[in-house]
Amino acid sequence: MIVVGIDHGTSGITACLMENKTVKSIFKMKRTEINENSFLKELEKHVNLQDIDLMGVCYSMGDGIDKITDINKVENRGVINLEGIGKKVGGGTRVYDEIKSSNIPAIVIPGLHKGVKSMDERFNTLFSHIASPEKISICYNAYKTFGFENFILSDISSNTVTLLIKNGKIFGGFDACVGAVGILHGPLDLELIRNIDSKKITANEAFSKAGVVKVTDSYKGVENTKFEIMSNYKNDKKCKLAVDSLVLSVSMEINSLMFLTPEKNVILAGSIGTWKNPNVSEMIKENIDGNVLVLNGESGAIGSAMIAEDILNGKKEILGISVDF
């Protein structure tokens, strides 16, 4: 059985090729690269496309579907629209359309939004959207890897999204624009709201630079800013303050969900959550009274492949989300 998982992230598209539960290869294409190159031609370097049994696809916010759905049943790529979601480059759209037109069997993973009825209704009342599709993939990877039925998952990268899993189902959580900051994205504070009202910037522009990048002079685009900030942690005061502030913010978000999970299992993921120097996970552990573990690797792409494989094996529900395939 050969499956492929796709993670549509802020800085690029990551693909995982898995055969019989074993990861065979992983590759990443920057979003700017995809505009000049075919994703499927790159994938073909790793596998005969006709041998693929199923692909698990993440695209954008995933707020137009509420089930894990056969790509041929999905309208408008599974989104309501592309407004208000951060900087748009177009690479993810091209990959999605390539996959759909290829006739390779594929499922599209939804985001977590108020239409997903398996979540606690209080979270759906509070927030219209909680997470983009790859966060479900990361959660499923963590669920399969560590075997916990109850845990908090915090994915820390360009943005931070923290989710709570109870009894093997996603219970709720905090989206990138609500709680903790990431490197690029974050919630809007008073100053940003005033700048929006005075039409100095749009709300989307504010969100796109409301992360700890605002502390520094280190913006290098969506693909390179995190490397600039993290690599200068020890020799640039602003970069150090940025990372220390991010750690505080994420720790606050995780702790805010801790009372809902007595087991106190916490799993950190994402490029920043797994960053070794500085060791972000150890910094967060100092602020958390719980069992803190790290999910290394390209967790979203691997999780998407795991979802595809288990659906082929007959699973009709993933973390509480129904399957229509």
UniProtKB/Swiss-Prot annotation:
Question: Which SUPFAM superfamilies does the record associate with it?
Answer: Actin-like ATPase domain
Q: Which top-level group of life is the source organism from?
A: Archaea
Listed InterPro entries: ATPase_NBD, Methan_mark_12
Q: Which NCBIfam families match?
A: methan_mark_12 (TIGR03281)
Q: Could you say which protein family the record assigns here?
A: Belongs to the UPF0285 family.
Q: This chain belongs to which protein, by name?
A: UPF0285 protein MmarC6_0247
Which organism does this record belong to? Methanococcus maripaludis (strain C6 / ATCC BAA-1332)
